UniProtKB/Swiss-Prot annotation:
The lineage of its organism: Eukaryota, Metazoa, Ecdysozoa, Arthropoda, Hexapoda. Antimicrobial and mast cell degranulating peptide. Shows broad-spectrum antimicrobial activity against the Gram-positive bacteria S.aureus ATCC 6538 (MIC=5 ug/ml), S.saprophyticus CS (MIC=5 ug/ml), S.epidermidis CS (MIC=5 ug/ml), B.subtilis CCT 2471 (MIC=40 ug/ml), and the Gram-negative bacteria E.coli CCT 1371 (MIC=20 ug/ml), E.coli ATCC 25922 (MIC=50 ug/ml), and P.aeruginosa ATCC 15442 (MIC=20 ug/ml). Also permeates anionic liposomes. Has little hemolytic activity. Blocks the lobster neuromuscular transmission. Induces the depolarization of the muscle membrane. C-terminal amidation is important for the stabilization of the secondary structure in alpha-helical conformation and for activity. The non-amidated analog eumenin mastoparan AF1 (EMP-AF1) has a lower level of alpha helical structure than the amidated peptide, as well as a reduced antimicrobial potency on both Gram-positive and Gram-negative bacteria. In addition, this non-amidated analog shows a reduced mast cell degranulating activity and is devoid of hemolytic activity. Expressed by the venom gland. Keywords: Amidation, Antibiotic, Antimicrobial, G-protein coupled receptor impairing toxin, Immunity, Innate immunity, Mast cell degranulation, Membrane, Neurotoxin, Postsynaptic neurotoxin, Secreted, Target cell membrane, Target membrane, Toxin. This is Eumenine mastoparan-AF. One of its GO terms (cellular component) is extracellular region. GO terms for molecular function: toxin activity. GO terms for biological process: defense response to bacterium; innate immune response. Belongs to the MCD family. Mastoparan subfamily. The modification Leucine amide is found at L14. The keyword Flavoprotein does not apply. It is found in: Secreted; Target cell membrane. It comes from Anterhynchium flavomarginatum micado (Solitary wasp).
Length: 14
């Protein structure tokens, strides 16, 4: 699990 990838996904979702 990549926290950076998840964080980037959340930012992109915004």
């Amino acid at each position: 699990i990549n926290l950076l990838k998840i964080a980037k996904g959340i930012i992109k979702s915004l």
